[in-house]
């Protein structure tokens, strides 16, 4: 790699040729404020907050798009630079609501942080026209507030370039410019998968997850209700970030203790139902493979992905596994098997799930998700929402003693916890399918062939003497490319895992912000560490799963299992 030499604020540094001044400065530990820039996205130089002085340039330049050159001298902290940045920021704030104290992004807002960093103490340009307030609260997952939009374009870029959905675009001119959907429809009537990546990258409160914490508090405070909660695999490796703990720390025990302090009657683990999903999905795959079923079979546990295929490729829906997601399987079992064992009227159970994903809110609201006669899951909150509840309750998270999940839905295996990262569902399925086919325990546990962070990975796996070609895909853009290959007949796989979000659930739309590739990698490493240190590492070895089948379901794909744990998907016309 060719390197160039430059000087930033008197510091001699080297940077790769073609990189930006901003990237060079950050690599040297020099802070330059940004709003439109995001490390996961292509830079556009829209906000102008990152302006610097650069030798050879007649005016201040946007460092996020200005390339380094040999011998360049850059100044990031002159009075001219500081005044220009402050002016840009004050102009943005003039057209921005002043409700920071009650905004959902209070404390996580990048605009708020930069205003403090730049020393903005009063606004010199008050009294101008402000953008009309329009709030889109139409769907179960996301809320958009146009008045808080600063036109950074991050949502447009992540939806177009990372997810390939292109739900958002700029519309209008001048002061009337806004981020809009097609024909200015609300998200409920747009081709939105509800993945929440736009909320992850939005620097303000213009796009946020729909806050359902009031529903949870109401249920907890109702003495007539039994409130049970499940926590997804990736929540335990990300929740700490909401509470001042560095990224990549596993906080399972403290999380369980915090949930008890909040008042939940039972604290269960979605890892239990992830193991259950593997039992059902794995046997479904074998049934298709051995009996000439529709192949490739594609996983269906990522609701953002399911929404996308229903919206864009409904003709390929027969490829989807009929197995419900772990969240929905858990809900069905909680209101039947658990209620029966505990002697509780299912009507009194409020089933809450803590998920890394905004699309899970929409999934729980689907008409199909009530096979037991009750909603499988009543309320879904994200990792961010749980963090807010813990802070609201005044819980000192770091001081909590670790606690264990409750039985009988609280035991999970290492195979279940790796659901939280791309390739994890595939690897978990292979661990079980291989031993089912072989009829005996096998020495191989880790399938490194399907690990990695490339957006599309493929491998040929020897499953007890049978060669199975598999693929692993993450991001909706990559998923669309895979579906085009299936349509063209060039995807000669038997089994495909798809996750909607970058990195899988570790990068979900409801996870703590800020997030970038390095943070996702730390969460991913924590997930695999959970697997390596698990006493049980194969789904079919979970004793609570064995008891569930032995005493209640009978066997995988039984009539009762099909009734409660499987579903079918349909085209969405919006």
Q: Where do the model's predicted regions map?
A:
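Fe-S ferredoxin-like electron-transfer domains
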Residues: 48-194, 200, 207-222, 226
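Charged, low-complexity surface patches
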Residues: 14, 138, 148, 191, ...
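Eukaryote-biased recognition of intrinsically disordered, low-complexity regulatory segments
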Residues: 1-11
């Amino acid at each position: 790699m060719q390197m160039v030499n430059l000087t930033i604020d008197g510091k001699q540094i080297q940077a790769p040729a073609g990189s930006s001044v901003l990237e060079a400065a950050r690599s040297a530990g020099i802070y330059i404020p940004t709003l439109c820039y995001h490390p996961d996205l292509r830079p556009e130089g829209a906000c102008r907050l990152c302006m610097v002085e650069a030798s050879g340039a007649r005016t201040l330049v946007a460092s996020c798009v200005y390339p380094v050159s040999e011998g360049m001298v850059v100044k990031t902290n002159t009075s001219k630079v500081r005044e220009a940045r402050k002016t840009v920021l004050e102009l943005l704030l003039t057209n921005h609501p002043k409700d920071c104290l009650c905004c959902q992004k209070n404390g996580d807002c990048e605009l708020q942080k930069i205003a403090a960093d730049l020393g903005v103490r009063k606004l010199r340009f008050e009294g101008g026209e402000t953008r009309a307030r329009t709030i889109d609260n139409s769907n179960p997952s996301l809320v958009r507030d146009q008045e808080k939009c600063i036109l950074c374009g991050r949502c447009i870029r992540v939806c177009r370039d990372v997810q390939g959905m292109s739900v958002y675009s700029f519309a209008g001119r001048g002061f009337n410019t806004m981020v809009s959907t097609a024909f200015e429809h609300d998200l409920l009537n747009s081709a939105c998968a509800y993945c929440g990546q736009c909320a992850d990258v939005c620097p303000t409160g213009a796009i946020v997850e729909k806050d359902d914490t009031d529903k949870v508090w109401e249920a907890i405070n109702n003495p007539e209700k039994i409130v049970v909660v499940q926590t997804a695999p990736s929540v335990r490796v990300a929740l700490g970030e909401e509470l001042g703990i560095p990224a990549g720390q596993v906080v399972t025990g403290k999380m369980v203790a915090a949930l008890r302090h909040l008042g939940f009657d039972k604290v269960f683990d979605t890892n239990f139902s992830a193991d259950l999903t593997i039992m059902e999905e794995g046997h479904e795959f074998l049934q298709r493979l051995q009996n000439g079923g529709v192949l490739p079979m594609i996983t269906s546990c990522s609701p953002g992905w399911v929404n996308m295929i229903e919206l864009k490729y409904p003709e390929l829906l027969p490829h989807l596994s009929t197995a419900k997601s772990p969240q929905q399987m858990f809900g069905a079992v909680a209101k039947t098997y658990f209620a029966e064992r505990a002697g509780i009227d299912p009507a009194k159970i409020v089933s809450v799930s803590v998920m890394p994903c905004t699309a899970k809110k929409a999934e729980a609201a689907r008409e199909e998700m009530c096979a037991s006669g009750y909603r499988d899951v009543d309320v879904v909150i994200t990792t961010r929402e749980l963090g807010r509840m813990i802070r609201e309750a005044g819980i000192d998270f770091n001081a909590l003693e670790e606690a264990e999940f409750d039985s009988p839905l609280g035991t999970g295996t290492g195979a279940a916890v790796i659901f939280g990262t791309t390739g994890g569902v595939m690897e978990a399925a292979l661990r079980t399918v291989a031993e089912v086919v072989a009829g005996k325990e096998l020495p191989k546990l880790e399938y490194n062939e399907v690990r990695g962070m490339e957006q599309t990975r493929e491998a040929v796996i020897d499953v007890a003497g049978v060669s199975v070609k598999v693929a692993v895909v993450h991001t909706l853009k990559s998923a669309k490319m895979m579906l085009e290959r299936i349509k063209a007949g060039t995807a000669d796989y038997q089994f495909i895992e798809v996750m909607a979000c970058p990195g899988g659930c570790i990068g979900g739309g409801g996870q703590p912000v800020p997030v970038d590739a390095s943070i996702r990698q730390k969460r991913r490493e924590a997930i695999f560490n959970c697997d390596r240190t698990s006493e049980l590492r194969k789904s079919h070895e979970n004793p609570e799963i064995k008891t569930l089948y032995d005493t209640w379901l009978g066997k995988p794909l039984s009539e009762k299992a099909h009734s409660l744990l499987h579903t079918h998907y349909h085209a969405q016309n919006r």
